[in-house]
Amino acid sequence: GLGDVYKRQLLHTPEFEHKYFDQREEKKPEDKMIGYIVVTADKGLAGAYNHNVLKLAEQEMAKHKNTCLFVVGQIGRHYFSRKNVTIDAEFLYTAQNPTLYRARAIAETVTDLFERKYLDEVYVIYTKMINSMDMEPEMLKLFPLEREDFEHPLQKQDHDIVTFRPSPEKVMDHLVPNYMKGLIFGVLVEAFSSEQNARMTAMSGATTSASEMIKELSLQYNRARQAAITQEITEIVSGANAQKDES
């Protein structure tokens, strides 16, 4: 995969430096501009799906004074708008229909802003599916790339002679945007799957609760009906007895 290409490139050119690995060390942490892509749903009725991811986003954004917000999903847009939080970009129709085309639009936007040094760090906050029953909000760092994430496991055993043409820099210029597109597409698909799973679980719970409520209401209705019938019979018998006594 692309990750293996990066690993091999760093293995054979350990002194290699590139703009996508720029940690912005010249800036103080409090002065850095941090970008957040927050992935929510377009609709509700999905249990705590939207609440959990928005809660994590707020917690992370509160840690920095300079933030840039990118929102995927109508729920996130409405939520931050109500709180008067500036939304720098919205990606419409993406939450319900994740495609490579839409992933490319997001990747190109944040990559360009990082290249131009408007953004110093970029994260995506979404819902990660653990299994069919469990999911949790997750924050994934996109930029800058970390060298240790691409360390080659066979650094001392790989003796191949590798040449990158036209240059290692040009290779990275081409590979990283494609890598980001694939990474973001994977995030969108996983978030969409988590949303559908959360909605199915919520609807299943609602159906169960509704069935139990109907059962309880039916029981109460039958009790009330039985009590009314008993009351009527009692009144009829009492009336008949009263007439007998009078006669």
Residue ranges of model-derived segments:
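C-terminal beta-strand-loop-alpha-helix "lid" module of Rossmann-like NAD(P)-dependent dehydrogenases
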Residues: 1-247
